[in-house]
A protein has these predicted regions:
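Catalytic pocket-lining loop regions of alpha/beta-barrel enzymes
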Residues: 1-80
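Short histidine/acidic/glycine/proline-rich micro-motifs that form metal-
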Residues: 41-42, 85-87
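Mid-to-C-terminal alpha-helical segments outside catalytic/metal-binding sites
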Residues: 66, 70, 74-80, 86-126
Length: 126
C-alpha cells in the first residue's frame, strides 16, 4: 500500500486471527484500508471453535467483542458486513446473527455505514 497509496484494500475476514489492536494501526496508516467482517462469527465458524481460538470472534448472537465494538464505532467507515455463507441452510441463521449480534449492537449511524453505505461508496454502486 505504501507503493500505491490510492489503492484500496479490503482485508478478508478482517484478518481471521487479528484483534482490533492489530487492525487499528493499519487503518491509521492507510486511509484506503478496509475490513470485511465475514467468517468471524457463528454459524460460519462453529461456536466450539471459538472456545479454543476466542480471538477469531468479532461478534456472535449475543453481541460484539468489546475491543471490536469500540473500533467499529470509532472507525465505522472502514468496515463492511459479510457472511461468506455458501450453505443455503445456514444463510438465514447467519443473517440473524449479523442483524442481532452485530448490527443490533451498533449506533444507527454506524449500522448504516457497515451494513451498506461503505460498500456503496467503496464499489461505486448507485
Amino acid at each position: 500500500m505504501s507503493a500505491n497509496p490510492s489503492a484500496r484494500m479490503i482485508l478478508a475476514h478482517c484478518g481471521s486471527n487479528t484483534g482490533p489492536e492489530d487492525v487499528k494501526p493499519l487503518f491509521e496508516k492507510y486511509p484506503n484500508f478496509f475490513c470485511d467482517l465475514s467468517e468471524r462469527s457463528v454459524p460460519k465458524i462453529p461456536a466450539k471453535a471459538f472456545v479454543h481460538k476466542p480471538e477469531k470472534m468479532v461478534f456472535g448472537p449475543d453481541g460484539i467483542v468489546s475491543g471490536w465494538k469500540d473500533l467499529i464505532e470509532e472507525m465505522p467507515d472502514r468496515f463492511l458486513v459479510g457472511s461468506d455463507v455458501y450453505d443455503g441452510a445456514k444463510y438465514a441463521k447467519a443473517i440473524k446473527v449479523i442483524r442481532k449480534g452485530l448490527l443490533g449492537n451498533l449506533s444507527p449511524e454506524t449500522v448504516e455505514k457497515v451494513a451498506y453505505k461503505n460498500a456503496i461508496k467503496l464499489f461505486g454502486l448507485q
